[in-house]
Regions:
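Membrane-proximal intracellular helices of multi-pass ion channels
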Residues: 1-219
Length: 219
């Protein structure tokens, strides 16, 4: 199946005709509701993925290059892709203590905002993004799935963030406290990054974090 998906992508990029079997594989890989329009949807997925990941890397570049020199280019690209794909992998544990994740950048508004945004954008799913790009603010034309995903995402970010702000991170300056609260409400569902020591969070916040992990992201 993996080889078939790679062949589909190769043929799509090269402009070759996509067979019925390949279209079926593409439908399965993208969780599309029907086979019709699957080639166009796959092209859209490739374009929007490249757009977000390259834009994210460009925004992360100043921070990582300032800390790691030319290696920062690779770090920016890697973490942008990892965040958008909701993978949660990082390269920062090789620079000191293990399992540090993004704690070094807890007070960096640019990096934490970009990473959090990439996680959210990647977690919405491509069918939701197709609705957003096609219908813009005409929300009543969105698929029901997209409406549910957007509403649930907003609630699952806002409510835990308020809880975390009220119960945790009291020792941080107000700006960092807001950043940490928002970041920790975004990342548990799909990515797994952290900018604070999770063991120091209250029991209630840890329980909410576990529930967010169980919830996950959109198809």
């Amino acid at each position: 199946i993996r080889r078939q998906r790679q062949m589909c992508i190769r043929d799509r990029l090269s402009g070759r005709k996509i067979s019925l079997k390949q279209r079926s594989t593409m439908q399965e890989a993208t969780a599309a509701p029907q086979m019709g329009g699957i080639v166009r949807l796959t092209g859209f997925i490739l374009r929007i993925t490249a757009l977000f990941e390259l834009a994210g890397a460009a925004l992360l570049l100043p921070t990582f290059c300032a800390d790691y020199g030319l290696r920062g280019i690779w770090y920016a690209l890697f973490h942008s892709i990892s965040a958008f794909c909701n993978a949660g992998f990082d390269l920062l544990g090789t620079e000191g203590a293990k399992f540090v994740s993004l704690t070094r950048y807890a007070g960096d508004p640019l990096l934490t905002t970009v990473i959090a945004a990439l996680i959210v954008f990647g977690g919405l799913g491509f069918l939701t993004w197709e609705d957003i790009c096609t219908y813009r603010l005409d929300l009543h034309r969105y698929r029901m799935q997209s409406k549910v995903i957007l509403s649930a995402t907003a609630l699952l970010i806002a409510l835990p963030a308020v809880l975390f702000f009220l119960t945790d991170f009291a020792d941080l300056p107000i700006g960092e406290r807001i950043l940490a609260s928002l970041f920790q409400s975004v990342t548990p569902r799909t990515a797994g990054y952290n900018t604070v020591d999770l063991t120091e969070m209250t029991d209630a916040s840890q329980a909410v974090t576990i529930l967010l992990m169980l919830t996950g992201g959109a198809p």
